[in-house]
Amino acid sequence: IEEDDRILVGLSGGKDSLALLELLARRSRIYKPKFSVVAAHVVMKNIAYESDQTYLREYAESLGVPYVCYETEFDPSTDTRKSPCFLCSWNRRKALFTVAKDQGCNKIALGHHMDDILETLLMNMTFQGAFSTMPPRLVMRKFDMTIIRPMCLVHEADLKEMAALRGFRKQVKNCPYEKDSHRSDMKEVLARLEAMNPEARYSLWGSMNNIQHDMLPVEEDDSLK
């Protein structure tokens, strides 16, 4: 976060985005760096996923944050190779880009936490054969926008505790595909790894900065020399 940023917070209505909005709203009142916050909730009309918009608006207003609701939809038949989760996520992201531009924002803040990032790392390794995940800061030059994930070092357990303390309301309807995704499976994998080694999450996180190319069965990339 930098001086004079105007940040759009993707407010889904889940505990993570509610926590992120509160934390950024409170942080914006500190003198340096000076930045402003806008909350945006995207309604995907063709997905049976619903949040209490009155609650979200009142919550944002209680924090002194402007609130925007944007409705959109997508046709899953246009690309049957992609899962509904991927198509929904991508179209929500595009909607956030649109709202961000309309609101004069230069950054979009998403509520992903450390658990999300590690689960994505495990998913990409398992299903994509790629050592990659969601970066804390991603410059999207095509859209002239930067995505940030300010809670990248926060544990989901801490956010659950915050949600209980604040009394955050739960979704009216959860996503119908939520339990069918690989993410729910990887959440269990991460829990099992931590049962074997309580420091497993820190080891996984550290591995992203400790890639020993000469100890891997792959050809060395000359650009890394």
What are the functions of these language-model segments?
Residues 49, 89, 179-182, 197, ...:
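Generic structural signal for well-ordered, non-membrane alpha-helical segments
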Residues 91-103, 137-143, 190, 194-209:
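Short, basic, helix/turn surface patches
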Residues 42, 74, 136, 181, ...:
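Residue-level signal for alpha-helical context at structural boundaries
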Residues 36, 107-108, 115-195:
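Catalytic subdomain that performs nucleotidyl-dependent activation
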Residues 199-225:
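A short, charged, Gly/Pro-tolerant segment at domain boundaries
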Residues 1-122, 127, 157-165, 215:
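ATP-dependent adenylation/nucleotidyltransferase module used to activate substrates
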Residues 73-76, 110, 174-178, 200:
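Short, surface-exposed helix-loop/turn micro-motifs enriched in polar/charged residues
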Residues 44-46, 74-76, 138-141, 154, ...:
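Residue-level detector of flexible, active-site-proximal loop/helix-junction positions
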